[in-house]
Amino acid sequence: CEFLNFPVVSGNVSFYNGTNNKNIFPTPVIGGVGLIQKLDKTMNHKFKKENSNLILIGKTFGHLEQSVFFHEIYSIFEGQPPEINLVNEKNNGESVLEIIKNDLADSVHDISHGGLIVALAEMSFETQFGVKINKPKKLTNIFEYLFGEDQSRYILEIDNINLEKTEKILKNNNIFYENIGTTQKDFFEISKEIKIDIKELYQINNQWYNNY
């Protein structure tokens, strides 16, 4: 809290949780307080237009232990959570705020549960815009890249007119970033591995959510 200058005002860990007559894992919950200086500087995560640049902030190491991918696909619940580098956490977050305050981003989303591909899908839901993502040349494992839950990462939608100013801020702050692709109309596309109609993706999500 002191390092991030972030006030946590409450917390709880319930060890006796039950949902639908089934036990669930212990669930830590914290409550924090933040201050938005100007409401017109708030930012949501919905894509706004096509042909925007998609900037990935933070390094991807492909951490899959304790990930949603391991839980849902392989029913693996063991392992260590991803490490958190507080310096990167603070610097990356403050750089994202600087970009937002300078009106350079059209949408922003943190990368957490589910990894990169889930964050991109959530940005596409309820819009007509999908993505066209290029795989890194040095990629060793597509699942680690798409579903890894490495911390301190963000996806920014940046218009071409604002790209140079955005990159200048990131370079001045010594932030690791990659331009991983663009937004496009109608389709959610990851290299040659995945191509799905946005409407179909939204329907699949609704079916899951309504039965959750």
Question: Where are the regions a protein language model picked out?
Answer:
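Glycine- and other small-residue-rich loops at beta-strand/loop junctions that grip anionic moieties
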Residues: 46, 85, 109
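Glycine-/charge-enriched secondary-structure boundary and capping motifs
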Residues: 4, 9-28, 78, 101-212
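Short glycine-/acidic-enriched loop or helix-start segments at secondary-structure transitions
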Residues: 65-66, 166
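Gly-rich Lys/Arg/Thr-decorated short loops/hinges at beta-loop-alpha junctions or inter-strand turns
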Residues: 27, 66-83
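A general structural motif
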Residues: 31-37, 83-93, 133-140
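Histidine/acidic residue-rich metal-binding segments in metalloenzymes
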Residues: 97
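Glycine-rich anion-binding loops of enzyme active sites
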Residues: 1-65, 179-182
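Phosphate-binding glycine-rich loops and adjacent basic patches that engage nucleotide phosphates
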Residues: 54-61, 78-87, 127-129
